[in-house]
Amino acid sequence: MEVILLERISKLGQMGETVKVRDGFARNYLLPLGKALRANAANKTRFEAERATLEARNLERKSEAQKVADVLDGKSFIVVRSAGETGQLYGSVAARDVVEILGAEGFNIGRNQVHLNTPIKSIGLHKVELQLHAEVEIHVELNVARSAEEAERQAKGEELTSVDAIYGVDEDALRPEDFFDPEADGVDEDEA
């Protein structure tokens, strides 16, 4: 089916272009959401008549998205989740969790604007891509940790995936001779 795009759609085309798409994609996504019109003579004349209005609305949406992007770009958010000693989360951080975190900070982002290839399943610093508009794309950083203190340590660059790093155990302080003191047991070293 051929459609006329009413806005820029990534991997498909620019506003005003006539593109051929699969029928299901047009019927279930593009047409109901108002992102395209069927490519027939009546709709072509309708599009040309409304082109200036559509371009102005698109420019307004882009400027709003750019304002949000200027505030959000490069920002870091702390996500506290329970995890095992190896750093594996008990659960995951998915797109809906990112939306909730940003919503708590006062940003209105939709779940379809968060681009995560796979859910986050380990502690650490993770970059998340947000597509606020077809032409405005930014990255935010999620600091996934077990506690706020651990998040601060991760932000400073510490690797917290081993038990020693998590609990601050010093390898040099734990020598076998510290655990066994022959004089404390009443055994002489000469007798042993």
UniProtKB/Swiss-Prot annotation:
GO cellular component: ribonucleoprotein complex; ribosome
Gene Ontology terms for molecular function: rRNA binding; structural constituent of ribosome
Spans annotated as Disordered: 173-192
Superkingdom per UniProt: Bacteria
InterPro entries linked: Ribosomal_bL9, Ribosomal_bL9/RNase_H1_N, Ribosomal_bL9_bac/chp, Ribosomal_bL9_C, Ribosomal_bL9_C_sf, Ribosomal_bL9_N, Ribosomal_bL9_N_sf
UniProt xrefs under SUPFAM superfamilies: L9 N-domain-like (SSF55658), Ribosomal protein L9 C-domain (SSF55653)
Coiled coil regions, renumbered to chain: none
Compositionally biased intervals (Acidic residues): 179-192
Gene3D superfamilies: Ribosomal protein L9, C-terminal domain, Ribosomal protein L9, N-terminal domain
Keywords: Ribonucleoprotein, Ribosomal protein, RNA-binding, rRNA-binding
Keyword NAD assigned: no
HAMAP family, A to Z: Ribosomal_bL9
Function: Binds to the 23S rRNA.
Family that this chain belongs to: Belongs to the bacterial ribosomal protein bL9 family.
Name of the protein described by the UniProt record: Large ribosomal subunit protein bL9
Species for this entry: Rhizobium leguminosarum bv. trifolii
Taxonomic lineage of the native organism: Bacteria, Pseudomonadati, Pseudomonadota, Alphaproteobacteria, Hyphomicrobiales
